[in-house]
């Protein structure tokens, strides 16, 4: 049986909310934390808001890194993984010395199931259907910031640091 991730589906809300809420109660989150890829749905966002409010906290910033679907499909379908040592590469951005062979251990590289274009397209469909409404949700709360994700990594990072005032 394929796992949820390999089918391009989202993990059930209840499980994710419980895990995140437990995690942000830890001592190392006392001075703040960044949630990457969560919440992904309105019910998750509402559950997070409720849980944070119970601790006298709230979401201070929501950042949407905007990247066209075509760019995402191209980026992800270019990723390659070594199943032997876990190293990751990209055929354009992080190429190997010998095409298709891991620089670290010499094993053959693979395109993971969740990076295949058809799986990425399914994940993007799920994103647009379930996650897109969060943009409106956080805009209405006055905490949404948008960053152009087509720029190079350093520029995207700098834009996020500027937003967070870090």
Q: Where do the model's predicted regions map?
A:
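Short, small-residue-biased leader/transition segments that mark boundaries at the very start
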Residues: 2-4
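Conserved alpha-helical scaffold flanking the Walker A/P-loop in AAA+ ATPase domains
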Residues: 17-27
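ATP-dependent NMP and nucleoside kinases share a basic, alpha-helical "lid"
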Residues: 28, 38-95, 139
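NTP-dependent small-molecule kinase module
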Residues: 108-166
